Amino acid sequence: GVSSAASDVYKRQMCFGVMQALDELGIKAGSVFGTSVGALHAAMYAQGSMDAAAALWDNIRLSDVVSEESLAIADDAENIFDHPEKLLEFITRYAHQKGVDVSPLMEILHRLIDEDRVRRSGVRLGVVTTRFPSLAMVEKRLEEMEAGSLHDWLMASASCFPIFPMKQVGGDRYIDGGFCDNTPVEMAVRSGARDIVAIDIGKHRSHTQYDRRPNITYIRTSQPLGGLLTLDSALSARNRILGYNDVMRAFGRMRGVSYAFDAVDAQALYTRAHHVV
């Protein structure tokens, strides 16, 4: 079966463009692995409710989940995703931060994600989080999670400290999985996935060792997607189109770099231009 390794902080609407394209291509994932918001989307995909996920980002207001103080920290947090060697310094700097009250976000997750439905789906689910204070990467698969703990593990993966508080699960504290691995393609590989579609929205190239694996389609975003906490309807619509186009290019249905053309139209344009020249 096909496995999808979802990157994050997913720039939200790009995910839905990606899933729309995969659906049109007839690609159904038997396993989904996600980090941070990508973990939330992975769970929603597993239970077959991506429309609900789209509605979440279409209707949520930033003020529902973060404070103005958190917005000021967002740029620093996003830079750390690209420079993990500075993570300890970053955590120390903001150690006094308690983060915002995430109970409204947890209520949204409980409303949108039904753990029993996810477990019955037959889709294998995995998430990445970061244990604190060791900063060790933790990969957690659905079958390893205690009954009733799925939402806790999803929040552990998406606890972008210090914007959000650390998440305690069992006796350990966790922060955002993106601090360790923003694109859990290696988790998919270790889980035995045969054919993998990996979506990487990071600013810098990562996991380049998988670029030429015949069983891995590694898709990197072709354009900047906006900031960590950007909630803008026009940007969201653009990102959805970018996600769709990037997947279609990767599977040969579209051509182009900065622009995307239907593969047949692109060949016709090339032929016409060649005759003109």
Residue ranges, per PLM feature:
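Single conserved hydrophobic/aromatic residue that forms the stacking wall/gate
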Residues: 1-6, 10
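Conserved strand-to-helix beginnings and helix N-cap segments that scaffold or border functional pockets
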Residues: 15-16, 185, 233
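Generic secondary-structure signature for well-ordered alpha-helical cores
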Residues: 58, 62-66, 114, 159, ...
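Active-site-adjacent alpha/beta core region of enzyme catalytic domains
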Residues: 75-198, 216, 246
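Residues in the short beta-alpha loop(s) of Rossmann-like NAD(P)-binding domains
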Residues: 202
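Short acidic, glycine/proline-enriched helix-loop-strand junctions
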Residues: 205-225
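C-terminal helical/tail subdomains of lipid-metabolizing enzymes
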Residues: 218-277
